[in-house]
């Protein structure tokens, strides 16, 4: 695994009331504290917080992805806001993660702030855009 090879793995951290994501290091041994509120009860991790532009590779969840590499997210805007903040900085490799059934052969709706992904990985393999 990436962890066994010495890679540092970061997980998204959502600050209450904020749209841009922070990323915190994953540590298998660290205790995780659940959010005190929120219907999703997303685990929150403690430690160093960094922004997306400091990452080498960013794996993005998606609802759909089109043939040009534009993703359709879940509508929260967290990844869009985080990626928009990297436009004028060194950007991480942006890789969409999903299933083959989420690929769309046409063009998905997009807005001016949407950014094209560098690739997509699913159970059938990898595609670079």
Regions found by a protein language model. Name each.
Residues 48-58, 65-70, 80-129:
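Surface-exposed, charge/polar-rich loops and edge strands
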């Amino acid at each position: 695994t990436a962890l066994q090879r010495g890679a540092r793995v970061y997980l998204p951290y959502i600050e209450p009331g904020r749209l841009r994501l922070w990323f915190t290091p994953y540590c298998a041994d660290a205790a995780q504290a659940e959010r005190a509120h929120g219907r999703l009860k997303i685990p929150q991790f403690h430690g160093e917080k960094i922004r997306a532009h400091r990452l080498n590779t960013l794996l993005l969840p998606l609802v759909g992805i089109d043939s040009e590499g534009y993703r359709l997210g879940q509508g929260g805007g967290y990844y869009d806001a985080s990626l928009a903040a990297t436009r004028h900085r060194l950007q991480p490799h942006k890789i969409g993660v999903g299933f083959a059934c989420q690929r769309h052969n046409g063009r998905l709706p997009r807005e001016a702030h949407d950014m094209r992904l560098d690739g997509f990985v699913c159970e059938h393999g990898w595609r670079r855009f």
